[in-house]
Amino acid sequence: MNVINGKIDCKPIETGYDESRIEILNKRLAEMIDKKVIHGAAYCISHKGKVIAHGSIGRNNAAGIDTAMQPDTIFEIASVTKTFAATAIMQLVEDGYIRLNTKVGEILPQFAKKPFEDITLWHLLTHTSGLYPDGGCFPEAAPKSAWELVDAQAEKWDGKSDFDWISAGISGGLRRPVGAEWQYCSFGFAILGEVVTRVTGINVHDYIAEKILRPLKMSDSGFYPTAENAARCFYWNCEQKEFLEKVTSGEANGHYDEGTVWDNIPNTAGGLNSTVYDLVRYGNAFIYGGRFEDARILGRKSVEKMSTVQLSGVPDHCWTANEPNRLYGVGFDMRQGPAYSYSEGTIMHEGSGACSLDIDLKEELCAAWFVPFDEGANGWSAEPLYNVQNIIWSGLI
């Protein structure tokens, strides 16, 4: 199966990385494509601040059209977006506008009443707010997820009056007491996006572009496809392909939710588009104390805070887990265990569908990979995620 190579800064051996492991990575990705676990893959690996591997294999779509995935294919990074929301919050902490223990109700009045009045920004960032988690985390069917509650209210919206999506989303109350349990809550990161907008007076999408994406020269990243880059976007079906073609031609502007209530809800839980190369630039900023090349997005102490385990003795039962002590940083996952070979203290985040960004601060190794699931994944598979991570980290000499 043909592998397309992208731009690199140096050969792997120059940074102390075994190039033969990249051959194994390509071999295993090809096998996963043959088994229909994934449609294709794009990856980028940097070591000691230098890109040492950058490639792609397989198809750039899930519609069965035989066009190749490229190293610079743009894709939806899904929940990896949450780390950008967390970074924006930390920037406002650094600038003295908020603290991690600021109560959400001090900024958003919908939270300034029972049972939400004790929820802080920190609780949202660590998934311990007690708010109902994403659908599918637990078997019970009611109350509905925040997104379903918003959707139900949106159907009644007259299209003219202000739509209170926050009240709609939290109308189910709390599933657990504040701080008692780790429950994966994407809605909490939409709330964090709204906090950024309210505190700065700048739409959070624009804030992230101005304060994170542009300084790091993440030129292929943004919340919506544009006429300039839509032709490079991965698509899941022919309907999405047609929409992207309209964006390319100028018939559509890329804002797929324009004119709906969703256009007013921050897409900071999972709406960013990027490339593996751009994500590695972002990851390197954390490896080097909040700076990369000539950009500064955070101070060193903020990076240390975000990459320090925040929870102690907080259980996680999401998706049938039975973890008595969930390891989590500020907006970043810090899971450890027999499935992973990265260093203790590594920060990472997965995106559904799937992709992963793993940042090993000790080894100065950062990897981003996009592995869109095919039918053989049955909705989710560890093989293109955890197994690939182990292959990548095995190259360290």
Model-derived regions: residue spans:
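Short, well-structured active-site flanking segments
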Residues: 52, 64, 72, 84, ...
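Short, surface-exposed loop or secondary-structure junction motifs
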Residues: 2, 116-341
